[in-house]
Curated annotation (Swiss-Prot):
Function: Multifunctional protein which displays endonuclease and helicase activities required for initiating and directing viral DNA replication. Also plays a role in viral packaging and transactivation of several promoters. Binds site-specifically to 2-3 approximate tandem copies within the origins of replication (Ori), unwinds this hairpin region and nicks one DNA strand thereby initiating the rolling circle replication (RCR).
Domain characteristics, as noted in the entry: In the N-terminus, the endonuclease region is involved in binding to the origin of replication. In the middle, there are the ATPase and helicase activities. The C-terminus probably contains a transactivation domain.
InterPro entries documented for this protein: Helicase_SF3_DNA-vir, P-loop_NTPase, Parvovirus_NS1_helicase, PV_NS1-NUC
Species name: Aedes densonucleosis virus (strain GKV 002 002)
Short name of one Pfam family: Parvo_NS1
Domain SF3 helicase span(s) in chain numbering: 594-749
Top-level EC class as recorded in UniProt: hydrolase
Cofactor(s) for this UniProt protein: Mg(2+)
Keywords in alphabetical order: ATP-binding, Covalent protein-DNA linkage, DNA replication, DNA-binding, Endonuclease, Helicase, Host nucleus, Hydrolase, Magnesium, Metal-binding, Nuclease, Nucleotide-binding, Transcription, Transcription regulation, Viral DNA replication, Viral genome packaging, Viral release from host cell
Binding site for a divalent metal cation: D370, H374, H376
Catalytic activity: ATP + H2O = ADP + phosphate + H(+)
Short sequence motif RCR-2: positions: 374-376
Protein name: Initiator protein NS1
């Protein structure tokens, strides 16, 4: 078939199809295909004659942009690429008829209308009808009984049949039929090249079968199906999926395949030899169970194969364990999208390749376009963008980006809606190399490389601007870009600060100043100015409040389990000496025993206070002499509870409780209860709602907040007996009578003091030690709480522990008891062996003497 005029055989074929359309067609699938083909070729004819020469007058491609400089509607040169596919205002009617002479009709008579785009002449009637549109009345008359449902009822009656396209056939010879035939040129568009012809076919296909495509402002998934339909995939040499010696492709810092650009040609890709590494692939075992037999066979092959061969083979629908992306058939492209960001090379460590060899994790999958002093990074992730931030962070860590580089990546991060436009943008500003990295090549990245190969080989060398400065890549129009930049700028700054706050676990503005690198803060000031500090202060406050609200809703058991899950593996290593940790736990139990305090009773009441379990009891007091271990116990027990600390010096201030509103818990150090403030203290320790003064604000209410107090003297020293009894009813009091020994000094420590001293702990006491003690006695603690419930009024609003937490605590309890027993047996064996060795040495000394 010619690309210009429709041949006689072609039209005879479809006339026969029309005559046969009323016959019985038993095969449902063939019937449906026939309807699609008829609609595709007859209702929407889209092949227009190319005669007339290059000087023909052509209207604009769309209502907003000027026509192509080459007279081509779908030009793909450097100058015209940004208009193709971006405008929804395209015109289907490209102008009036040109009046070009056509060949005669089949009956060799001069046609009545010479500008009809078909080989059959529709002779003019005695009077040319004035109406050129089909109104409702004519539609009912001319299309009666001609719909798909009327002609092919089996399409709707068959089980599982898909819904046919909604169109109807006009009655042959009717007025509507004549109008459609005479105005069929409205559906024609000029085509001058093979690529333009294929592009137009795809546009008609998209109108017939709408897909998730891209628009100017939408956030739908990008796809390369249009290019893949037009030309075959162009492969290049190199095995992007072939395994290295230790099955850790891409982890050693070398790219899987590289495309070097030299002059105006493209050199075949090469795969650098993978270096060996002593690190084992921790994720290998987990991914083996999810891989299909096809992917295993593909990975185990040792021969070299190019991407074209790989594209012809089936790719298993598996999940990339590292990035959580679907790596499978073409249908998965609708669920993924492309993302990009920029990294300058001075924001990446020079030895990043060596650093990559020390990592045991799999390398992320991405493509880099080298622009000299900076690189553009392209990767695929979920279309919703929920996983894109995590993948971007993994890529920056793999490239060993500095703090300034991480900020730059976050600032320049954006979604790629038009893959072809993005690659043309990279080509326009010059490319030195194109690299693919990753332990596993995703299908989306393979399609991106195929698209790059096609566009690079068909580029115009005069359009490449090698010395031009690379501009930021934006796909919006200028007006949309200006509207977006203000909001996006604030959003980027907020995301950068919030990500850093979560990474460093910052809760105050001063921690931001102390822990954040100066280079990172300077980079933010370059991009956003001096208002960064106000953003930091506000975001830190919001994040601190969020954390407090989460902790406030948890039981002490849940918090202890979180500590174990995060810290246990650091302190108990299988096969190593864990005696120091075991000795610390024994020392904590020894501390409570020396002070005549039941440790189970103490831990149970801490859980009661934290969960607000009983009415009118909202405080716990630790009273004892200096250096008795009061702060040591509470600091480690409440480390993750994060109580608001209030020192004694604020008692004389009218705003000494302004920190309490919104706090999850409170820790008072050496407070002074006087006849003046005893009423406030009773309400606070009872759990009633009170109001307090806040500077430059109205009074703020204080809801029931768990309260802990440490004091060296009784807190009721300054009030009378009646008030004392009321205070003691609202608290749980524990008295520490012995002090912890600081040093051995025979001049300062006498016999009387020596009897009141407790030996120093074997090493630094940490929250993990208190968590082990708590969970190890979990069952006993909750049994005691059940007994205490009988003697107290239970608060109906108390925080309850759920069954999942109980099951996890019980499993941890069993594991800890077994571990501690094993460590004790090992320790006893070591001590016995040491004693035996000592006896043998003494015996040898006596024998020699």
């Amino acid at each position: 078939m010619e690309y210009g005029l429709i041949s006689k055989f072609y039209m005879d074929h479809w006339r026969w199809k029309i005559r046969e359309k009323h016959k019985v067609e038993n095969n449902l699938l063939s019937t449906y295909k026939y309807i699609l083909n008829f609609h595709y070729h007859m209702v929407h004819p889209y092949i227009r004659s190319t005669k007339g020469g290059p000087n023909r007058v052509m209207n604009s491609v769309c209502v907003e942009h000027s026509p192509c400089e080459h007279g081509n509607l779908f030009c793909e040169c450097i100058y015209c690429w940004e208009h193709d596919g971006q405008c929804r205002g395209r015109k289907l009617d490209l102008g009036a008829s040109t009046g070009i002479e056509r060949r005669l009709a089949n009956d060799n008579q001069q046609p009545g209308l010479s500008d009809l785009y078909c080989t059959e002449t529709i002779h003019l009637a005695t009077a040319i009808p004035e109406r050129r549109t089909i109104d409702r009345e004519n539609y009912v008359k001319d299309f009666a009984g001609q719909t798909v449902g009327d002609l092919y009822p089996q399409l709707q009656g068959s089980t599982g049949a898909s819904e046919p396209i909604d169109f109807a056939f006009p009655t042959v010879g009717s007025g509507s039929w004549e109008i459609l035939v005479r105005e069929s040129h409205k559906h024609f568009e000029p085509n001058y090249t093979e690529e333009a012809y294929q592009s137009h076919i795809r546009s008609v296909r998209r109108r017939l079968f709408p897909e998730e495509t891209m628009d100017n402002n939408g956030s739908q998934a990008s796809t390369t199906e249009m290019l893949r339909d037009a030309v075959q995939r162009c492969g290049f040499e190199g095995p992007p999926n072939s395994p290295s010696e230790n099955n850790r492709d891409g982890i050693d810092g070398t790219c899987i395949s590289t495309v070097d650009i030299q002059s105006n040609c493209i050199v075949n890709a090469h795969c650098p030899k993978q270096g060996t590494s002593n690190q084992t692939n921790k994720r290998k075992k987990s991914t083996d169970t999810t891989e299909s037999s096809g992917s295993k066979k593909n990975k185990s092959s040792n021969y070299q194969q190019n991407l074209q061969e790989q594209g012809s083979t089936s790719i298993s629908d598996t999940i990339d364990i590292v990035d959580g992306e679907l790596d499978g058939s073409t249908g998965s492209n609708r669920e993924t999208a492309y993302y990009t960001f920029v990294l300058h090379k001075n924001n990446v460590k020079e030895d990043w390749r060596y650093i990559a060899t020390t990592r045991a994790k799999q390398a992320p999958s991405f493509i880099t376009f080298d622009h000299g002093d900076h690189i553009h990074i392209l990767f695929s992730s979920s279309n919703t963008g929920g996983n894109s931030t995590r993948v971007r962070t993994r890529i920056t860590k793999f490239l060993s980006a500095t703090s300034a580089g991480s900020a730059e990546a976050t600032i320049t991060f954006s979604k790629v809606k038009f893959l072809r436009n993005y690659i043309l943008y990279c080509i326009r500003y010059g490319i030195e190399t194109v690299n693919i990295y990753g332990n596993k090549i995703q299908q989306q990245l393979t399609e991106a490389m195929d698209t790059f190969k096609i566009l690079f080989e068909n580029r115009d060398p005069n359009d490449v601007i090698l010395e031009a400065g690379c501009k930021l890549y934006h796909e919006e129009k200028k007006d949309n870009k200006q509207k977006r930049c203000g909001q996006r700028k604030q959003q980027n700054l907020t995301d950068i600060i919030l990500e850093k706050i979560k990474e460093k676990k910052i809760t105050t503005a001063q921690q931001w100043e102390n822990q954040i690198e100066p280079e990172f803060k300077i980079q933010l000031m370059k991009e956003f100015g001096l208002n960064v500090d106000s953003y930091v202060t506000r975001i830190v406050r919001i994040e601190r409040t969020r954390i407090q609200q989460l902790i406030k809703a948890k039981t002490l058991t849940e918090i202890m389990l979180e500590i174990l899950n995060d810290e246990y593996i650091k302190h108990f290593t299988p096969g190593e000496d864990n005696s120091k940790t075991a000795k610390c736990i024994e020392w904590i139990e020894y501390l409570f025993k020396e002070n005549n305090i039941n440790i189970i009773h103490f831990l149970a009441w801490n859980e009661i206070i934290k969960t607000k379990r009983y009415k009118k009891i909202n405080g716990m007091v630790l009273e004892g002499i200096t250096n008795a271990g009061k702060s040591l116990i509470l600091d480690n027990l409440l480390a993750m509870v994060k109580p608001e600390e209030i020192p004694r010096e604020r008692d004389n201030s009218g705003f000494h409780l302004d920190q309490v509103p919104g706090a999850g818990s409170i820790l008072f150090e050496e407070p002074m209860i006087t006849p003046v403030n005893v009423g406030t203290w009773k309400l606070l320790l009872e759990g009633k709602t009170i109001k307090t003064d806040v500077k430059n604000k109205d009074k703020e209410p204080i809801e029931r907040t768990p309260t802990w107090i440490t004091t060296a003297t009784p807190i009721t020293n300054n009030i009378d007996m009646n008030e004392t009894s009321q205070i003691l009813q609202r608290i749980k009091l524990y008295i520490l009578k012995k002090s912890i020994q600081h040093r051995d000094d025979k001049y300062t420590i006498n016999a009387q003091i020596q009897n009141k001293l407790i030996s120093r702990p074997p090493t630094l006491i940490e929250p993990i030690h208190m968590a082990i003690v708590f969970i190890k006695n979990f069952t006993k603690i909750y049994n005691l709480i059940a007994e205490e419930d009988k003697a107290h009024t239970v608060n109906e609003k108390a925080i309850q522990i759920n069954n999942e937490v109980k099951e996890e605590a019980e499993s941890w309890q069993t594991a800890l008891q077994w571990t501690m027993t094993e460590n004790n047996e090992e320790q006893n064996e070591n001590e016995t062996q040491a004693l035996e060795d000592q006896v043998l040495e003494l015996a040898k000394e006596q024998a020699t003497t």
